[in-house]
Curated annotation (Swiss-Prot):
This is ATP synthase subunit beta. It catalyses: ATP + H2O + 4 H(+)(in) = ADP + phosphate + 5 H(+)(out). The keyword ATP-binding applies. F-type ATPases have 2 components, CF(1) - the catalytic core - and CF(0) - the membrane proton channel. CF(1) has five subunits: alpha(3), beta(3), gamma(1), delta(1), epsilon(1). CF(0) has three main subunits: a(1), b(2) and c(9-12). The alpha and beta chains form an alternating ring which encloses part of the gamma chain. CF(1) is attached to CF(0) by a central stalk formed by the gamma and epsilon chains, while a peripheral stalk is formed by the delta and b chains. It comes from Mycolicibacterium vanbaalenii (strain DSM 7251 / JCM 13017 / BCRC 16820 / KCTC 9966 / NRRL B-24157 / PYR-1) (Mycobacterium vanbaalenii).
Length: 475
């Protein structure tokens, strides 16, 4: 407990949108990140406003960021220093409920007030306590398991521009992994649509997974302070399950870009000089503070899946570029693949994984994956020639390769559980062994006699046989 932990009162002296300057008595200035409370009474409105100390301005003044709209707040209002930072409830009781960034329960107001609370500002685990993981997390999605295998206890990101399927794929992973995981899941909705949060709540309840999932939301209608802190609030809940209960935890974050965007808004409001492309000068530091806490320690882990919006499909933008350095696997969603009607719209040549290595996944898996990548890369290299001269001008070997590449592209598509209500087709799950076997046969030419359409939006070999038969061909 610090010297400023005793509750002291100050006064609001300046309000600029979500930025509030507060003056405290000499010697009682609150520390950075302390939470302050201000009581607002305006007409029929009565509420407690939470402010977080962001800067010390000198002369007993602090600059704070409000976590709620400042409507009704006026100069002279008394502000109380709580002596601690923002904290959220932790423990088994948070499962099955929705919280905001401040730890207030949204589906059952007042719930969780008497729970143990942890500060959202925490240090990452010590380096000596970290435990590298190389175990593969099987998803049942062919394109992911074959070409960008996910690491259990690792950090995984889904990159993509607007409208290419990031949120759908995140929901698909929740359906596939959380159902079979058996552990605890935490979902952070950072600056995304409220409708999507409601849809997720309903889907989790229908799938009987809600009882093992905690949800924390700070959606796009919230002030930037809330959107900047909600990921830390969700992560704190996940850390409790990892550190105190020794559980393997799944952490879903949608969307990391909104976390960066909120930080940029706050930085501008605080008057900091902008850095590249207008982002905050502290971008790398803020991203590191979040990502370094998402890690595996001895015998327990947090496996995170993060959606990352790519502004204007520009992967050199500082927001997605800063995220890359922290990841174990990247799945890049492509507008070009999306335009072909191939879902999930994963770009197999741009996606990567640190465990696509024969020492981890085995020689057979690695060999088949590399052959698939080789064929797709050669097909990409031939695109310009095909566009100018036509496919008939290619050598026979290249013609055959192009036909196989087109079959591979379509076979990488798959019906998803999260899209069942829209497509009317049940989602399919393909075991890794079957995926490797099927693509091995495909790259060797065993399926050259089948029409391309037979490979489109199906699961494994059984689905391929049925689809081929319906098109008048035999496997």
């Amino acid at each position: 407990m610090t010297a400023t932990a005793e509750k002291t009162a100050g006064r609001v002296v300046r309000i600029t949108g979500p930025v509030v300057d507060v003056e405290f008595p000499r010697g009682s200035v609150p520390e950075l990140f302390n939470a302050l409370h201000a009581e607002i009474s305006y007409k029929d409105l009565s509420k407690t406003l939470t402010l977080e100390v962001a800067q010390h301005l000198g002369d007993n003044l602090v600059r704070t960021i409000s976590m709620q709209p400042t409507d009704g707040l006026v100069r002279g209002v008394e502000v109380t220093d709580t002596g601690t930072s923002i904290s959220v409830p932790v423990g088994d009781g948070v499962k099955g409920h929705v919280f905001n960034a401040l730890g207030d329960c949204l589906d059952e107001p007042g719930y969780g007030k008497d729970f143990e609370h942890w500060s959202i500002h925490r240090k990452p685990p010590a380096f000596a306590d970290l435990e590298p993981r190389t175990e593969m997390l099987e998803t049942g999605l062919k394109v992911v398991d074959l070409l960008t295998p996910y690491v259990r206890g690792g950090k995984i990101a889904l990159f993509g521009g607007a409208g290419v399927g990031k949120t759908v794929l995140i929901q698909e992973m929740i359906n596939r992994i959380a159902r079979n995981f058996g552990g605890t899941s935490v979902f952070a909705g950072v600056g995304e649509r409220t409708r999507e949060g409601n849809d997720l709540w309903v889907e989790l309840a229908d799938a009987n997974v809600l009882k093992d999932t905690a949800l924390v939301f700070g959606q796009m209608d919230e002030p930037p302070g809330t959107r900047m802190r909600v990921a830390l609030s969700a992560l704190t809940m996940a850390e409790f399950f990892r550190d105190e209960q020794g559980q393997d935890v799944l952490l879903f974050i949608d969307n990391i870009f909104r976390f960066t965007q909120a930080g940029s808004e706050v930085s501008t409001l605080l008057g900091r000089m902008p850095s590249a492309v207008g982002y905050q000068p502290t971008l790398a530091d803020e991203m590191g503070e979040l990502q370094e806490r998402i890690t595996s320690t001895r015998g327990k882990s947090i496996t995170s899946m993060q959606a990352v919006y790519v502004p204007a499909d520009d992967y050199t933008d500082p927001a997605p570029a800063t995220t890359f350095a922290h990841l174990d696997a990247t799945t890049e969603l492509s507008r070009a693949v999306f335009s072909k009607g191939i879902f999930p719209a994963v770009d197999p040549l741009a996606s990567s994984s640190t465990i696509l290595d024969p020492a981890v996944v085995g020689d057979e898996h690695y060999r088949v994956a590399q052959e698939v990548i080789r064929i797709l890369q050669r097909y990409k290299d031939l695109q310009d020639i095909i566009a100018i001269l036509g496919i008939d001008e290619l050598a026979e070997e290249d013609k055959q390769l192009v036909q196989r590449a087109r079959r591979i592209e379509r076979f990488l598509s798959q019906n998803m559980m999260a899209a069942e209500q829209f497509t009317g087709q049940p989602g399919s799950t393909v075991p890794l062994k079957e995926t490797i076997e099927a693509f091995d046969k495909l790259t060797k030419g065993d399926f050259d006699h089948l029409p391309e359409q037979a490979f489109f939006l199906i699961g494994g070999l059984d689905d391929l046989a049925k689809k081929a038969e319906s098109l008048g061909a035999k496997l």
